[in-house]
Structure formats: structure tokens, C-alpha cells
Amino acid sequence: MMHIQTLRKITILDVQDKQRCLSTNQNVPDNVFQLIACWCYFPPFLSIAKIKPLIALKAGISENPVLIGCRRIKMAHCPYSEAMTRTTSVEDVKFEIPAWDNSNVDVADGSGRPESSTSGDTIRPKGRIRRSMTACNTCRKLKTRCDLDPRGHACRRCLSLRIECKLPETAERFQDNASMWSDATAAIPSIEERLISLERSMTEMTSMMRRMMDRSPSISGSSVSMLTRSGITDETASIEGSQSSSFAPRPIRLLQDLQSDFTGEANVLPADSRSLGDLFTKGIIDPKLSQKLIQLFVDHFGIWISVDNPSDIHNELRATDPLLYSTACLLASRYVPGIPLSVIHAMYLQIRHATVNVLWNKTPLKHETLQALALLALWPTAVQKETPMDSWLLSGISINHAIISFDFLNHAPSDLIVDNDMVAKLRVWNALCLTQLQSAIGNARPFHIQQRYLEHCPRLLEHPAATFEDGKIVAEIQLYLIALKLQNFSHRMRLGDFEYEEIERWKMEWAHLLKLSLWYCQLLLYRTAMRFHWESEHLISEILRNSRLILSKFLLVRFPNALAFPDQIYYIVGYAALNLCDFSPMDPLIDQVQTFLLHLSPNEDHIAYRFSYTITELKRRCATGPNPHNVVKGAFGDTRKLSMGQQIPFMNPLMDTMMGEYGGLEHLIPEVPPNSLPDMLTSVAGELQAFRTAIL
């Protein structure tokens, strides 16, 4: 075998000479066969320049009959014979180009021209494979690479130059275009249907707006411009002047009016209540009883205003801030049944008088004073014999004081870090905002807190000390904001929707925290929609369903927890019971709730006791079939009733107006004879002394 170094000395011209000998049937020198054998054994050691002539030489050997019978090339011993032959016989040996060879090499003859013809069955080396043309015209002209996505319709160069990308048509691109056009063709009918539906909806809305304008000729352009100049914007989150506000139900006002009508009380304060002094300094509540009341207050009410320890409310507060101290004792008195009603009544009158004076004090108010105002706004009906404090007015004025007193409200929510001091202020702020929302939606009154102030409410949850109750308050604030917005969009109520996208989004985040408030808001929305769809059976069924859910949930609460409920919970339960009386007076849940409320009430002045009687009386009158034309004067206010000229269908249910001509309830609620202030204080002192002897 010829040495590898000797093979490298063979030039291309020598091999080409041997090829010419083959073409003329001349004798081939021995070194040619040696070269071919070395190529079979050591192909990697040959350069590509020497391989090209060997390819042509191989083809010449297969054509020369003299060389076919030559046994000097022992292909059976060649390790690359499997890649070069198709059969094992020498006669049928056909040389193939190995896998490592370049199949696109052009074979040239001695003249330097590529060989273009073959003879017989000889497989000659193929020429350059013509690749499919995929580059666009621009890239081909520039002779650059065309960076094209296989599924794209333009290359990056054309996109960057913002010119048309002309691509050659290929089978794959043709199939993509065909599928795209087929999809577009299939979507055309659905698009046309949607357009027709939109046109129909626009026509209905236009006709509805025209009817509304015809029914309300008093609304002129000047009045609209006046509202615009008054500064009512979306930022204020106000609903004042909304047309649908006259259609919204007023559950708080309704329950208060029904209670007044059924009990026959005048709902006025005694004329001498303003001259009431400090009952604590007169010895009405001694230190031992006050300590017990403060401990009860911390256990059941302190979480609302960040009071976790009785030491947070010092005895010195009697002199420095008597309002918070008195409010704490008043709220805790419901947990001590032995305290005489006259004592509680005297405490309540003193607190009302102190509250009036505090609201007009010099600003800014102390933090303890704002805490007391927040508690009074949450529990305004501690005593039911007089007109309860208006929670909407009380919380509204307190919010204005809080804006002045709390510095963090004057900054963006992201500017400050929530520390312990800010947590205490945020709890008071959230309680005031929640009370304002509850009273606004419960009395169908406007809500004026600006959105930039409301954005501070959820910041309380960023602090590690945030509690489960803090999350419930934040969730309830957001829920009432959504309900208030929906309730006062007349077009949403006129559509009679049963599901609201805004509430569904709220459910995904907060539904696990609140149930009663959610059902209550849905109940209010359905009652509002019923003003425009009074014959809707689905609305009636939804009203009954939500009312039953509220009452069933309330019947599961524990007695200690029920006494600490804010007054809003009792309004929710009372309104749900009245709805059942209106549509299904024989529902057994009505009697169950009435009995449960009577069991919960610590005394006759508690809101649960009064609502229990109101529900019982309303059920009795609904079951006897009342005359809807005999209404109680002022039960809901003449300004709320719709005139016949409006021609808007609405229902005149028992929930809005109740029957009159009923006397007092001396058999159930004992009458307290009016006494002068000195006599009342003397009697209170005597009763308290007897209570101390028996209890303490």
C-alpha cells in the first residue's frame, strides 16, 4: 500500500491524466489503483481538491470494460464499501459518493467545462440542487439573507424599511392563505349577526331616551349646565341629582317610620335634655361599675377603634374626653341586664348633648373624640324611645373633622408607610366611611367622599396587625360603593339585569368574608329594578331568595356575638323580614326571626326588641289583606312617591307605605310616664342603688 505521504504528493493533474487514459481505453498505471485503494481505506486523509478528480476517475472505471474485471481493487476489505456499493458482486459494483462528500461538486473535464451528459445506466454525479426560492424580491436584489418567519407575510427587512414584501408563492404559504381566508369567510356570518344585534340595541336605547325626554320636559339645558358648574364629577363619587335616586328603596327610613307608626311614639327629645349634666360626676356610675363596663367594651367593641386593653381608656378620660368614656359605658351596658332602663336613658341623653357640642368645637378634634364619633355613627340607635341620631349627618360631619385631623389623608396612599399610629387612624377612618355608605344607601341619600380619600381604606390591610374584621370592613366598603353606583344608574335598573358583572368580580375576591351584606345589596338592587319591571316573576323570586338567605344566616349567630352587632345588621335583617311579609307573609322564617330578635334584646329599648314587634305587626296586617289606598301620612315621604304624570310603571307594595289608624301598644311595651329632670335623676339614683346591692 502506498504511504499516505506519497498520496499527498499526487497532484490533480496526475489524476486527470489517468482519467484521460480511461476515456481512450489506454492502460492505466498501477499507481492509479493504489490511489483508489487508499481512497477506500483512508478517505478522511485526502483533501477535497484531490477527491474531486477521484470521483470522475471512479465513474471512468465503471465505464471501462477492461477495468471492470480487474481484481486489484479489493472492495470487500474496504471499510467504506457498504457506503459505496449496493450489491456484493464485483460486476454490479457501482460507486457512490460517501456521506461526507459534497454532492454538489461539479465534475469538470480537461477543458474546464462541467460534464453534462451521461451514457447508459451510469449514475453520474448530480449537479447543484435547485433550492426552492423563498426570499422576497428586495432581499434577492440586495443579495442578503431574507429573515422570514415560516408563517409570516413579510420579512424583517421589508418591515423595517416599510416597503411591500413580495414573496414567491409556495405550497405551504398557499395553504396558510387558504386556511386564513376560509376562517375569515366562516366568521362573516357571526360578525353580521353581532352588527345586527348592536344596531337593534342602539335603536331601542334611542327610542327609550326619547321617551324619557318626553316624560321629563322640566329638565332643561340650563339645569344641566348648573350641575356641571357646581363641580359634580366622577372624582367625588357623588350620586346627588341622579334621576334614579327617587326610585331607590329606603330601608332605614322605612323601618324607622314603621316603628314610629306601630308604637305611637312621638320620636322627639325631651325639652330639658339639653340641660343634662355629667351623670358620672353625680355618682350615677360608680368606679367599680365603670371598670366592669370598660372591660366589656374592650372585649366586644374595642376592635373597631384599636382599643385592645382597658388601660387604653383611663379614668382620666372622664375629665379630658368624657365623650369616649361615656360612649364606651353606654355600649357595654347591653351586656349588664341589671342596669335600670332609666340609667341607660339618662346616659344616652347626656351623650347626645355632648356630641352636639363636640361637633362644633374648634378643629382639629382629638383622636379620642373621633373614636367616640365613629362608635356613635355605628350604633346610633342605642335607645329607641327617642329619634335616633342621624348616622348620615353624624358620619358626614365626623369625616370632615377627620380630613382635617388625619394628616395622611392629605398625601397620596403610596407616599406614606403604614405604621402603628396610622393603623389606629385608618380603623377610625374606615369605620366612618363605612357608616356614611350604609346610611347613604339605606336612606337613598347622596355620598360625597372623594375617591382619593377612599383609596386610603384598603391600606390598612398592608400592616401585619390587620385583623379579619379589618378585611371585612374594607370588603364591605367596596361592596356598598358598587351597589350605590349600580342603584343610581337608571339605564342599568331599567334593563332589569339579574346578574351584575361588578358584583361578580367582587365575589371572586371578597365573597368568603361577607354574606349578609352581599345578599342585602342584591336585595336592594332587585327592589330598585322592580320599579321598572313590576310584573317580573324572576325579580320577585330573587327578592324572596335573598331575604330567606339573610334570615337563615342570622338565625345561626351566637347570642354574645349578636349583642355586639352594629345597628346595620339589624336593619338588614328587619328589611329582609319585611320583604317576606310583603310577598310571602306565611313564611315560617318570619316567626322564627321575630322570636329570635325578642330573645336577643337585652331590654325594651334595644333595636332588636322594637324590630321584633314591628315585624310581628306588619305580618299580621299583610296576612289580613290591607287596603293599599289607605296609607300612613309621611311613611316614606311625599317627595319619594311618583306622580301619575310620569307614566312609569311601578309597584305600590306594602314595603313603601303602611296602613294607619292604629293605637299604642300598651299591652306589649309599657309606657314610661314623662318626668321632670330632677325627679328622673332621683329615681335613677334609687334604682341604681338597688342594682348595686343586688349585683355588685
UniProtKB/Swiss-Prot annotation:
A single GO molecular function term of this UniProt record: DNA-binding transcription factor activity, RNA polymerase II-specific
Q: InterPro entries, alphabetically?
A: prtT (IPR051089), Zn2-C6_fun-type_DNA-bd_sf (IPR036864), Zn2Cys6_DnaBD (IPR001138)
Q: Do the record's keywords include Isomerase?
A: no
Q: What CDD domains does the record tag this protein with? A: GAL4 (cd00067)
Region Disordered: list its residue ranges: 106-126
Top-level taxon of the source organism = Eukaryota
The yes or no answer to whether the keyword Transcription is present is yes
Q: Return the GO cellular component terms, semicolon-separated.
A: nucleus
Q: Where is the signal peptide?
A: none
Q: Which residues bind DNA?
A: 136-165
Compartments annotated for it: namely: Nucleus
Q: Which UniProt keywords apply?
A: DNA-binding, Metal-binding, Nucleus, Transcription, Transcription regulation, Zinc
Query: Which Pfam families does the record match to this protein?
Result: Zn_clus
Describe its function: Transcription factor required for protein utilization and degradation. Regulates transcription of major secreted proteases including a serine alkaline protease (alk1), a metalloprotease (mep), an aspergillopepsin (pep1), a sedolisin (sed2) and two dipeptidyl-peptidases (dppIV and dppV).
**Family the UniProt entry places it in:** Belongs to the prtT family.
**Name listed for the protein in its UniProt record:** Transcriptional activator of proteases prtT
